[in-house]
Amino acid sequence: MRYAIMVTGAAYGTQQASSALQFAHALLNEGHELASVFFYREGVYNANLLTSPASDEYDLVRAWQKLNTQHGVALNICVAAALRRGIIDETEAGRLGLPSANLQPGFTLSGLGALAEASLTCDRVVQF
């Protein structure tokens, strides 16, 4: 089956993002296709390059990036939610006159159209 995941919880402070990542790995291990992960609302914090967990904590942000590089899973974050929460890429930083970007490599700023497309092209969309 072809799946998409929507994550609405931040990388730390809730169980949503880590549960979503575990579910993503379980899907891939069982031979399913994971087309994309869409980060919405507080979920956009999963794409913050500046997140720096303690050395004895799991680095969830880099784990998402690893999912992208190893399995080619698209990591889309809602551009409107991201901008409201201070997550920006180089293009938006330049457009807004900000000194730097903080979007983790592997993630892409996207509109809700990416979520709509995933809903139309996947057999299941699972929200965390």
From Swiss-Prot:
Principal subcellular localization: cytoplasm
Membrane spanning residue stretches: none
GO cellular component: sulfurtransferase complex
GO molecular function: sulfur carrier activity; sulfurtransferase activity
EC number: 2.8.1.-
Enzyme class, UniProt record, top EC level: transferase
Task of the protein: Part of a sulfur-relay system required for 2-thiolation of 5-methylaminomethyl-2-thiouridine (mnm(5)s(2)U) at tRNA wobble positions. Accepts sulfur from TusA and transfers it in turn to TusE.
Family of this protein: Belongs to the DsrE/TusD family.
Designated name of the protein: Sulfurtransferase TusD
Source species: Salmonella newport (strain SL254)
Lineage summary: Bacteria, Pseudomonadati, Pseudomonadota, Gammaproteobacteria, Enterobacterales
Gene name linked to the record: tusD
